């Protein structure tokens, strides 16, 4: 049995099926379900599946720095909270700026200044207050610039962690995406341990290719053992494609995050 709450993205698995059927498949596998843009979805139909939804995109447009963009992010976050209510979804995910359908920033922001960081922290304080009023948690996700999201501000986990720690609210947590972090930063075990006090969930996929654990260079069983050894029992979500059969991908994911011996326990490797 995994010590973590396991989840998976319905956006990236069983993609030959309608979304409601993907959700049912993940739920039948005992997983929390995650989705992205809720505005294109039949929310009552998704709710009717009876699945446990864990995370969804928490804004439609906007950004963290420019005052007008920040106001738009807050306005669309309020709409997203209403959607989360329909699904009973506890976590709403945001990024450093609004992304288009290709994952590219609507307004590229290549250089982040100290003033930008301060402005972003103020916006995130407002977002945390909104989450508190509605009894929900917003998560801020790190991305990567090299492969998937060039031009996105606050892409590094180092930056997103600093922002979440500065706001220091139970209603704003870090969505630590280890696929993105491996591309941009590496040193995943130390990153996880440093971030754990502020983590709302951890997302995973292997590098390169963004498929399930075991298809790339990351030794996820070692990461899982470190997390378990540190006492983490929260959400770990597969946000990646299946290299082949999706059911097999889910089994590989589950196996990687069911560590036999936590790091630091008797019999663990040094």
Placement of each model-derived feature along the sequence:
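Histidine-acidic metal/acid-base catalytic patches
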Residues: 1-29, 39, 88-90, 99-104, ...
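Hydrophobic anchor at the start of a short beta-strand
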Residues: 6, 33, 53, 138, ...
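Glycine-rich, proline-tolerant flexible connector loops at the mouths of alpha/beta enzymes
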Residues: 34-50, 57-58, 64, 99, ...
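Short, charged, surface-exposed secondary-structure boundary motifs
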Residues: 63-68, 212
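Residue-level detector of anion-binding/catalytic polar loops
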Residues: 32, 52, 90, 137, ...
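Conserved beta-strand positions in the central sheet of alpha/beta enzyme cores
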Residues: 34-37, 54-57, 93, 139, ...
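Active-site acidic/histidine proton-transfer and metal-coordination neighborhood
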Residues: 67-173, 183, 266-269
